[in-house]
Amino acid sequence: MSSVPVIILHQPKRLIVGAGTIGEVCTWAGEVSSTLVIATPITAGFVDRLKLPGKVAVFDAIPGEPEIATLDAALAAARAAKPDLVVGLGGGSVMDVAKLLAALWDSEQTLADVAGSNKVAGRSTRLAQIATTAGTGSEAGIRSLITDPIKGAKIAVESPHLIADLAVLDAELTYSVPPVVTAATGVDAMAHCVEAFTSKRAHPMIDGFARMGFHLVGKYLARAVKDGSDHEAREGLMLASYYGGICLGPVNTAAGHAIAYPLGTLLHLPHGLANAIVFPHVLAFNEPVAQEKTAEVAQALGLGHGLSQAKLRAEALGFCADLGIEMSLAKHGATEADLPRFAADAHAIRRLMDNNPADMSVDDVLGIYRASF
């Protein structure tokens, strides 16, 4: 008799969900002498809603794919501010930087020291994560990704010391997210759930979160793209994103994200868009070895029942394209000459590729890029 694999599930110490709940942060924070908010120029517009006491500094120079230099600049800002509270106010890039900042600003450890799993020595600064997009689910997790532009690769840091003390899911903060960004980040949230659900490392407990996540995306993503102020849809996607973030902890993603990463580091596509472009092709590739679970995903997304591999790919492509996502790599500036480098880099990301239900050769990965071209 096989036993259920042992997993450790980390979640934020406190989670607040609901409209207007950004206003609850000040009550939770209590007496704070110095706060550093990590944001983008757009999300910095929400800082006043925090109503935090004491000194509040804002670092808003966070690009779509934060690099080592981004983290270094944020660390310099933190050492000047000496915060007793760090707030990540934004999407995944913002929250990933906030995690590392809270752990490293007053530490002798560097990014190189903590790269990998369970190398962060500790954290003395409180961390609040406030999601302003529904995609990465970074507010739920213990991982942070920073791009090394010289190597063209992502540096992954995983540690329970990166988990938030407080996470806030306030769907009102997502009303102004443009339709095309809503679409791409929504597919990213779905991909987290689907990749964990079909993974070689799938776990029955995480399957429950994954199911809730991709069902919510199937129900609400098109609605939110059509009407950004549809609160029910926006809130459903925030929950889907959070559930996807939970999936990343003990199970993680697989080939889909590995194949998407070079599109961010080398082609400089936003993370959600990169994942959306490859999602239909990876879903179809894995179908022969994950038939029951793939069929469940297809049903939840309204793709149909009893689909052939080719029909599944076509329907999933249609699902993404109907959301307004441009699904051609060529249209995003890629050339055919780029594809072998993308494939080699993606195939080398073994921490994700080894989770995939179907083994992929470099040629298989190249085939997915060509199908996406």
Model-predicted segments: where are they?
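A glycine/threonine-rich phosphate-anchoring loop and its flanking beta-alpha core
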Residues: 13, 23, 106-202, 293-296, ...
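N-terminal small/polar loop signature for handling phosphorylated ligands or for N-terminal nucleophile
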Residues: 45-113, 118-119, 222-234
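ATP/NTP phosphate-donor binding region
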Residues: 1-85, 329
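Gly/Pro-rich interdomain helix-loop hinge
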Residues: 266-338
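Glycine-rich phosphate/pyrophosphate-binding beta-alpha loops
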Residues: 135, 242-275, 350-355
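Glycine-rich phosphate/diphosphate-binding loops and the adjacent beta-loop-alpha structural elements
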Residues: 195-250, 261-264
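Short, amphipathic C-terminal "tail helix"
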Residues: 336-373
